[in-house]
Amino acid sequence: MATFNLTVVSAEEKIFEGAVKSIQATGSEGELGILAGHIPLLTGIKPGIVKITREDNSEEVLYVSGGFLEVQPNIVTVLADVAIRGIELDQERILNAKRKAEDNIVAKHADVDHNLLVAKLSKELAKLRAYELTEKLVKNKR
């Protein structure tokens, strides 16, 4: 299968760069699967998981807080405010943040925007999913 160059950059650092067979992400209009030869595209991506299949068929999962995905001939770039490798996610920290977000939603504070609380919970759920997928990939390697 043909490959293309992928670069994933957060506001702080380059997270990934290399030859890949495919990338999956959630775009503003739905799920995206990008393979070599994909038509040029520029789209927003939603907070969630970016799944990468490398040249050697190994897979890596990243969490992104949202951003943009650009497809050019043989080059794909993901620009995200926050991008974290699945192996760097801390399950305990995620679960604590998730519980706090759930508690805040239930408390219904008048001075806090409910939509912001739901967005925070959604991000924590996406991080948890990225963590779980990474754990599954690690177990399958053993």
From Swiss-Prot:
One of its GO terms (molecular function) is proton-transporting ATP synthase activity, rotational mechanism. It is found in: Cell inner membrane. It is a peripheral membrane protein. InterPro entries: ATP_F1_dsu/esu_C_sf, ATP_synth_F1_dsu/esu, ATP_synth_F1_dsu/esu_N, ATPsynth_dsu/esu_N. It comes from the Bacteria. Belongs to the ATPase epsilon chain family. Produces ATP from ADP in the presence of a proton gradient across the membrane. F-type ATPases have 2 components, CF(1) - the catalytic core - and CF(0) - the membrane proton channel. CF(1) has five subunits: alpha(3), beta(3), gamma(1), delta(1), epsilon(1). CF(0) has three main subunits: a, b and c. This is ATP synthase epsilon chain. It comes from Actinobacillus succinogenes (strain ATCC 55618 / DSM 22257 / CCUG 43843 / 130Z). The lineage of its organism: Bacteria, Pseudomonadati, Pseudomonadota, Gammaproteobacteria, Pasteurellales.
